[in-house]
Amino acid sequence: MTITLRNLLASLLILGVVACSSVGKNHPAVTTTSDFTIVPAINMQTPRSGHTATLIRDGRVLIAGGMERNGTYFNSVELYSPATGSFNFAHSMSARRVGHTATLLQNGKVLIAGGFDGSGSLDSAEVYDPATDSFTPTGNMNSRRGDFTATLLRSGKVLVVGGEASSALASAEVYDPGTGKFSRTGDMTSGRTMHTATLLPSGKVLITGGGDYQKPLATAELYDPATGSFSATGSMAIARYKHAAELLPDGNALILGGSDGRDWRGQYVSAEIYDTAKHTFRLAGNMSVARFKITEAVARLKTGEILIAGGGERCEVYDNRTGSFKLVNGQMDTARFYSTATLLADGQVLIAGGYDTHGVASSKAWVFKT
């Protein structure tokens, strides 16, 4: 989950001035597909943005933490049941968290780590057990982090990368579920926050963009679990942060949207593809609207297409077979930022929360249907 508390609070002050010029600019070349539609769902119990949403093994979705516009930070947790289409409160976390991460472990439990609690970044972590609906503290990270990434490796361990404390961090660490401890691993070549991390078929992890506050990078690097080290791997066409990345069926990675560091004034409509064989990036066409703050609002469908569900009123899908974007039937009430999109067991997608162009968090949810 990537959301910088400092950046979020500052940007809320200027949303009303710039949002109309930066959000919802349509590009007619994008067509509409009748294969998919989006419909309203029952609301969450609490308005949230910057929360996490994790599909657990029994098919429910764990919604954890987040915040409201007024600076209310949550330790509360909800569970969405596809069987009933409803949200119900679960046991709360031990700490209030926004900009944290949630990772489904191989044992079916969920690792919640870091984030911001309103007074600064956190190093604490806890594990949620769906069988008992309870959180248990686990070892602390070696560094306080918010706006970082956490990636489940093939070994079952979790790679934690970058993020922000007082500045962007280059450090990384690995969580071992067997010991419940975090251990340091090699550093990145650059400090990064608001970046993306994508597990590739090779087992390596692709890190793209991010950077320090309002200073995004175009560079990318690969983490090799075998050596515990990072190495540079090409550069994107443009510097991006607050963007999204998703693995494509062919093993390449799709990089979507983001901003040039000016936030609302600098949103991108463009996309790029990382070629895992050539270690290079190439442009991949434009979305229907410029979108940013969408890191958790992207999901790969069972068809292999990529759903982009944040940053605009309309959802769209990217078809790797044709290399094109298509709008989805139906729309949300407004563009939403720092929302979540979670692929459900039946192939539908739960879209939840986020804040609007006035910075107001929502409890509304939608279901993307195939």
Where are these regions (language model features)?
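Bacterial N-terminal signal peptides that target proteins for export
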Residues: 1-9
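Bacterial N-terminal signal peptides
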Residues: 10-18
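Kelch-like beta-propeller repeat domains
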Residues: 21-370
